[in-house]
Amino acid sequence: MEHGARLSTSRVMAIAFIFMSVLIVLSLSVNVIQGVNNYRLQNEQRTAVTPMGFNVPFAVSQNSADASYLQQMALSFIALRLNVSSETVDASHQALLQYIRPGAQNQMKVILAEEAKRIKNDNVNSAFFQTSVRVWPQYGRVEIHGVLKTWIGDSKPFTDIKHYILILKRENGVTWLDNFGETDDEKK
């Protein structure tokens, strides 16, 4: 009888140990799954927004944005740099500099200061009218084609066809303008 009770106790203890081990493994796996889900909710949750003045909603997350958002930001950056006059150029360029990474601001400040100096000295007014926009959201690349009209003093406007490429990056909830370049389309 004593031998049977001891065997039964060992069997119950073994079953309890196996049951507790299974519970621990399940608990650990549920905690890992919860951790992954919490990370995704924190960093990849998209918020849909329809800004004032636009009729197209866009979605942004902590580290990414959709094509509509990138297009709207690129058009805003184009307006800040190209839709200027001798009175508004400083404020527009200062607003644009807020979206340039701090490490690259000095280089861009020099470029914008040269542009502002020419605009003020020659009493230039300019306006950019986009004709087409292409967006590659996976690369943060936006290509904008359009017509830049430039008035020097009281003269008739000069018209140039322009093609700009903007590279936008979204990191930790902040949108950065990594590149604002102009390309020359080859005449065919």
From Swiss-Prot:
Q: List the disulfide bonds.
A: none
The UniProt entry, under InterPro entries, shows: Pilus_assembly_TraE
TM stretches of this protein: none
Record keywords, A-Z? Conjugation, Plasmid
Superkingdom of source: Bacteria
User: What is the recorded function of this protein according to its Swiss-Prot or TrEMBL entry?
Assistant: Involved in F pilus assembly.
Q: Which family does it belong to?
A: Belongs to the TraE family.
Q: Which NCBIfam families match?
A: TraE_TIGR
**Name the UniProt record assigns to this protein:** Protein TraE
* UniProt organism field: Escherichia coli
Gene (name only) = traE
